[in-house]
Amino acid sequence: VYARGKKEFVFAGMRTKFDDANNLTYGALVQRRHVGDDAPDRFVAVIDCRGSKLARRFFTRWHEIAHRLTTHADKLEPVYRSEHDPLERLMDEIAGHVGFYEPLFDPVFRSASDGKVHLTFGVVESIIASTFPAASFQATLFACTRRVTTPVVYLEATLAHKKEVKRKLATKSLFDDDPPPGELRAVKVIQNKAAHAARFTIPTNMRVPADSVIHKLFNFEPQTDGDAQEDLSLWESQGRTLEARAVVVEARKVPGR
């Protein structure tokens, strides 16, 4: 609605970029050309809140603000870099600190987590409800994982193929065969500092074991939660399992994940 009548061609092509499944884009910062330098909307952040991207909206907003504070906007057309690009990772780091300013966030976090052995979704939701109502669950969860001293691994799982199948699907074929069904895999894995120091992780794209609460929740309705005490030795790939390690798993079903 906002872009209509603004006479800015750049807005017209954004949906195509946001729909590109091979280069996930959550937002873009635009410097408008047909407006004065003193216009309040000279710089516009466009944030994709559709589907599973909705969970990242708060973080994406601060990511684009970080661009404005540092790299500014692309004057002609936004550059849609990969989320793994070093510049984008730097913007994520800035967004995480600016969006949850430490002198304000830390006292709230300490109060909410006082007496808790592990970081839980309940702690995250308590922080949102009490002090940061505009923050998304995911962004607040990331802010919490950066501050806990216990190893935490954030994981997103969805249907995907193993690397060999992906390569075959990317190769053009004379036959229009249907692709094999995907398996539930860990498509995004993020460690906090404590987990990195302890070498505690789950390899990206590893198949989620059927006995894990993550797998059991996948076909539930969105916003369904579950938790369990599990062992990393459940995770297996090509006949090899992860090193045995007792873990507490808390999972939430969201659209597409």
Feature names for model-found ranges:
Residues 1-257:
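Active-site hotspot residues in diverse enzymes, especially metal/ion-binding acidic/histidine motifs
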